[in-house]
């Protein structure tokens, strides 16, 4: 009888006993597609670059800056100190990207800015003027100096509020009037509401003076200077500062005078103008910064408004002087007062004003107010990052206090102070400590603030000459602003100089040793994702963050790589964790509104995750998982058993030599699950194929997304190149090759061997008399040679017959239960092999033998 057998893909499962006829045990340089075995042509070398053994292309950075189109390979040299390089895709010269031996976990890019993400922070590289300029978060440090005008010796001004007799007397619970009004009044308790009115009336007199000049400041004003990025967000702060005008806390009640027939009250104070100067610590960031903005609150006297007893008496005349010594608020009340004061943007200055003194103006309370989410001063380190929807996603992250040189605000009074070595030990509420070593002037500003949450206190260790000093600052954790604030006040004047206590050299050196190795980590989360602002790699709004339970996130991948940016859908982003895969869904504003687990598959090789047109592929303990939306399937189940090594077959080397097929290329000896542990994948977009290779093996698997079947090719690859839609990889010679090679014209050598076939007669002995291989190919010699194997037990095989053409005839002899067909030859790219026709006869049991 005649059996028509169609050749299928490479399989290892089910076992040889249960497999179907036409399945392949060996498939060299062939892939099953369109019901045929098609040749896989060799990849073509592209570009001129040649990489050394330890050099790996981690990223391809492409873009357009002012009409200048660029496309660069970002290369990591894993030998030595781990240098990073860039090279034009058409060039061969490697140019260093200076990262100061920074350990990088992943690389991504947005526009012309590269982002190198590591555990200890993030490095950025800006492409401009044909080079990469690197910078990091601490490079945004800037110095702030405040100058007072007129100078500190400006005389006090007196401001008076006048009242009529009846109006004034109504302000007191008890009062008596002397018989002679010219002598004065003897007053009782000054009510809180009365004091509030008096101070308000005096303030009105002050405001009348201020109306003449918008640059004059009264009382106490708090403020902050913020460095402004290209998109209007803020990336660094000067810290909280104070504009302090002298206010005498004596409220004096005056007797009637010749010019005013009634009482009056007065207070003395100074009014000043202020100038502020900002200077950058480095010019690395000048192309990203557009200037700086200044936010101030409405000035406040900070006086304690409450009931006060009668003022002092004149001891000689026994008449009341009616002078009240008012108190300032302090401690918790002072901090609460500061928290309640909105900050208003009073000025915006551009880069031309950097390094110059600019005049400050008072806020009027209608300007734009400060939002704490506008400031992102902490650096962020992470296990990895991923760019999706035009936003940078960081996972398994740590927030790091990157600025070791504390941005002290310097006042006029500090200009003459000598610089000294400081160590700041910042103690957080959770018990964690952050150590900073820096050089600053010995005079500490009146208001000291840090962009650190839950900061309890800071111990300052100060060395000047041979002397060692110590001082502790206690902090208030602001509920309104992203600062921990420390304010020192004595009487009516904020301290601009702090008394340090003497300490010993040992204490200083112990803290110095800790500061040298401090990781500066403020907080961390293994189960959360920080999502940046759109088109900004450095700003991460709190509302954009999302968590995935208590799992540790190991990798992220978008549902579709080619159109991932700006896409919305049911499953736009997957998070691969140590407990399975989570699916994150976006709302219309690009914020993650929901998250849920998809499956319990754990990715075992996060560097090998691959994105195709409509699916994510990754390795797990079961094999390669294809994730499409909410559904998933294992595409390597057919390979999940013991692989077949053709070299164990009789006369295998002689047969392989006829087609110059290397024996190592058909020696499948590693189980697929072990193979996947170090495997990488490349997606051939144009052919809809997946190439799976392990650099330590001589064969690579190739999978057709159209047919869902496997083949193999020679493995000449050592690493992949992530550059969609090209299917690029680096070969063992260090050259970049394209797996999609439509211009190939040469013959492709191939070899395949089927799995055991029963020919529709299982467990029955049979004899094959002739065999013809069918397909679309020229009937030339060496197009298709045949070898026929037979066995009765699936383990011991004999070579029955061979042929140099597609025809195998004249076979006779002992019948067998199982047969294998091996074919060897070469095909042109357009040719293919479909199957075979077999003339087979079961053993005749009713014949004489």
Language-model region placement:
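Disordered, low-complexity "stalk" and linker segments at domain junctions of extracellular
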Residues: 1-54, 59-65, 86-531, 544-545, ...
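Conserved loop/turn at the beginning of each blade in beta-propeller domains
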Residues: 52-53, 100, 378, 549-552, ...
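Extended, low-complexity, turn-rich repeat/linker tracts enriched in Gly/Pro/Ser/Thr and Asp/Glu
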Residues: 440-446, 775-783, 828
């Amino acid at each position: 009888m005649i059996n028509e057998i169609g050749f299928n893909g490479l399989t290892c499962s089910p076992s040889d006993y249960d497999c179907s006829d036409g399945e392949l045990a060996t498939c060299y340089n062939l892939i099953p597609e369109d019901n045929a075995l098609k040749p896989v042509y060799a990849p073509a070398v592209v570009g001129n670059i040649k990489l050394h053994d330890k050099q790996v292309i981690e990223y391809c950075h492409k873009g357009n800056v002012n009409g200048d189109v660029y496309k660069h390979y970002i290369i990591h040299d894993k030998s030595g100190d781990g240098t990073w390089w860039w090279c034009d895709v058409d060039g061969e010269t490697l140019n260093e990207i200076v990262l100061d031996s920074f350990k990088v976990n992943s690389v991504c890019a947005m526009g012309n800015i590269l982002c190198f993400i590591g555990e200890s922070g993030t490095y950025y590289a800006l492409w401009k003027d044909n080079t990469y300029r690197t910078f990091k978060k601490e490079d945004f440090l800037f110095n702030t100096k405040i100058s007072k005008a007129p100078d500190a010796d400006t005389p006090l001004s007196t401001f008076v509020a006048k009242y009529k007799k009846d109006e004034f007397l109504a302000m007191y619970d008890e009062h008596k009037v002397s018989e002679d009004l010219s002598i004065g009044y003897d007053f009782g308790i000054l009510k809180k509401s009365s004091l509030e009115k008096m101070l308000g009336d005096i303030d009105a007199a002050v405001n009348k003076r201020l109306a003449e000049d918008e640059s004059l400041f009264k009382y106490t004003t708090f403020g902050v200077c913020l460095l402004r990025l290209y998109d209007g967000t803020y990336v660094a702060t000067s810290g909280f500062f104070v504009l302090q005008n002298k206010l005498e806390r004596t409220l004096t009640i005056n007797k009637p005078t010749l010019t005013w027939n009634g009482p009056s009250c007065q207070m003395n104070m100074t009014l000043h103008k202020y100038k502020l100067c900002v200077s950058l610590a480095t010019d690395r960031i000048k192309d990203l910064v557009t200037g700086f903005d200044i936010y101030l609150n409405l000035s406040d006297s900070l006086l304690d408004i409450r009931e006060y007893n009668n003022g002092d008496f004149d001891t000689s005349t026994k008449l009341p002087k009616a002078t009240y010594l008012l108190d300032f608020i302090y401690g918790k009340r002072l901090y609460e007062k500061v928290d309640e004061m909105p900050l208003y943007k009073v000025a915006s200055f551009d880069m031309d004003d950097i390094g110059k003194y600019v005049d400050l103006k008072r806020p009027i309370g209608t300007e734009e107010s400060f939002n704490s989410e506008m400031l992102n001063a902490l650096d962020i380190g992470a296990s990895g990052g991923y760019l999706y929807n035009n936003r940078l996603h960081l996972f398994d992250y740590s927030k790091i206090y990157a600025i070791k040189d504390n941005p002290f605000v310097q006042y006029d009074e500090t200009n003459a102070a000598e610089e000294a070595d400081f160590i700041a030990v910042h103690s957080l509420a959770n018990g964690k400590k952050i150590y900073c070593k820096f050089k600053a002037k010995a005079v500490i500003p009146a208001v000291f603030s840090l962009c650190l949450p839950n900061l309890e206190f800071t111990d300052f260790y100060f060395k000047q000459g041979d002397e060692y000093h110590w001082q502790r600052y206690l902090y208030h954790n602001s509920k309104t602003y992203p600062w921990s604030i420390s304010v020192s006040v004595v009487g009516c004047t904020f301290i601009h100089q702090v008394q340090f206590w003497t300490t010993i050299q040992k204490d200083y050196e112990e803290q110095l040793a800790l500061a040298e190795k401090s990781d500066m980590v403020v907080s961390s989360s293994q189960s959360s994702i920080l999502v940046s602002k759109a088109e900004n790699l450095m700003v991460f709004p709190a509302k954009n963050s999302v968590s995935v339970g208590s799992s540790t996130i190991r990798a992220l991948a978008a549902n579709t790589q080619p159109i991932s940016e700006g896409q919305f859908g049911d499953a736009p982003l997957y998070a691969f964790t140590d407990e399975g895969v989570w699916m994150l869904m976006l709302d219309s504003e690009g914020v993650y509104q929901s998250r849920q687990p998809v499956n319990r598959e754990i990715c075992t090789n996060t560097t090998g995750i691959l994105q195709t047109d409509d699916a994510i592929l990754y390795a797990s303990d079961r094999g390669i998982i294809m994730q499409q939306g909410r559904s998933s399937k294992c595409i390597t189940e057919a390979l999940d058993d013991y692989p077949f090594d053709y070299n164990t077959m009789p006369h295998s080397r002689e047969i392989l030599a006829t087609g110059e097929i290397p024996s190592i290329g058909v020696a499948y000896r590693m189980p697929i699950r072990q193979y996947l542990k170090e495997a990488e994948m490349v997606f051939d977009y144009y052919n809809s194929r997946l190439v799976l290779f392990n650099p330590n093996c001589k064969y690579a698997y190739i999978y057709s997304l159209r047919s869902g079947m496997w083949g193999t090719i020679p493995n000449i690859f050592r690493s992949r190149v992530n550059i969609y839609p090209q299917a690029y990889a680096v070969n063992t010679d260090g050259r970049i090759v394209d797996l999609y090679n439509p211009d190939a014209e040469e013959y492709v050598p191939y070899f395949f061997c089927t799995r055991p076939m029963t020919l529709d007669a299982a467990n029955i002995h049979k004899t094959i008399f002739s065999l013809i291989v069918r397909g679309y190919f020229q009937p030339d010699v060496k197009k298709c040679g045949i070898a026929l194997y037979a066995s009765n037990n699936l383990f011991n095989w004999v070579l029955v017959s061979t042929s140099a053409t597609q025809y195998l005839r004249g076979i006779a002899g002992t019948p067998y239960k199982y047969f294998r067909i091996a074919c060897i030859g070469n095909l042109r790219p357009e040719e293919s092999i479909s199957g075979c026709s077999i003339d087979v006869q079961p053993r005749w049991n009713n014949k004489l033998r």
